[in-house]
Amino acid sequence: MIVPFEHVLILAGILFALGLVCVLVWRMNLIMLLIGIEVMLNAAMLAFVGGAARWGMADGQVFSLVIMALTSAEVSLALAMVVYLHRRKRTVDADEFSELKG
């Protein structure tokens, strides 16, 4: 059974909206900010894969692989920064990044 393309887009829109709410509501907590960005990127990836399946083109699937590589690099760098901030300041508040130097 194939899922209709409209359902895929609705699910991707709901996921993107949830990620956006997470980013907007918890923008001071860096962990929640990262989770929200990841959910939004996964929603975009779902829309690309759904579109690729709908029109029979591999471009959306290739672009989803690019998004996966981008998100893995983004998460590894951001989590390293969060761990550094937590060790130095004992908090994961986004405002504390402005006080770090070096």
Curated annotation (Swiss-Prot):
It is a multi-pass membrane protein. The keyword Transmembrane applies. The keyword Membrane applies. It comes from the Bacteria. Keywords: Cell inner membrane, Cell membrane, Membrane, NAD, Quinone, Translocase, Transmembrane, Transmembrane helix, Transport, Ubiquinone. GO terms for molecular function: NADH:ubiquinone reductase (non-electrogenic) activity; quinone binding. It catalyses: a quinone + NADH + 5 H(+)(in) = a quinol + NAD(+) + 4 H(+)(out). It is found in: Cell inner membrane. NDH-1 shuttles electrons from NADH, via FMN and iron-sulfur (Fe-S) centers, to quinones in the respiratory chain. The immediate electron acceptor for the enzyme in this species is believed to be ubiquinone. Couples the redox reaction to proton translocation (for every two electrons transferred, four hydrogen ions are translocated across the cytoplasmic membrane), and thus conserves the redox energy in a proton gradient. Belongs to the complex I subunit 4L family. This is NADH-quinone oxidoreductase subunit K 1. It comes from Geobacter metallireducens (strain ATCC 53774 / DSM 7210 / GS-15). The lineage of its organism: Bacteria, Pseudomonadati, Thermodesulfobacteriota, Desulfuromonadia, Geobacterales.
